[in-house]
Design a protein with these regions (language model features):
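Retroviral integrase
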Residues: 1-99
């Protein structure tokens, strides 16, 4: 029998404050060389942002966050990234360099 995990509510504070980032791919290559899609979903409004990229690394994710989230909606206080956990520290370092 499979163990059932307990659900935990996510506290919400203000609009565009908490984002979740996921990576879609490896997809068929596009004419521009893109093979992945970075997708961000805001927890409260469920607003979505997405961008096709050629590779997934700390630079591409931090550029996506800076250009598509921070410039449009302001700084967030919470960021949830599942698959690319090895990039989290470098992503945050790159974002803080931009400020």
């Amino acid at each position: 029998m499979q163990k059932i995990n307990e659900l935990h509510p996510i506290p919400l504070s203000r609009l565009f404050d908490r984002w979740r980032v996921d990576i879609v791919g490896l997809l068929p290559i596009t004419p521009k060389g893109n093979r992945y899609i970075i997708v961000a979903v805001e927890y409260l409004s469920k607003w979505q942002e997405a961008k096709a990229v050629t590779e997934v690394n700390a630079l591409s994710i931090s550029n996506f966050l800076y250009q598509n989230i921070i410039w449009r909606f302001g700084c967030f206080t919470h960021l949830h990234i599942d698959k690319e956990t090895e990039f989290v520290n470098e992503i945050m370092e790159r974002l803080t360099e931009k400020f």
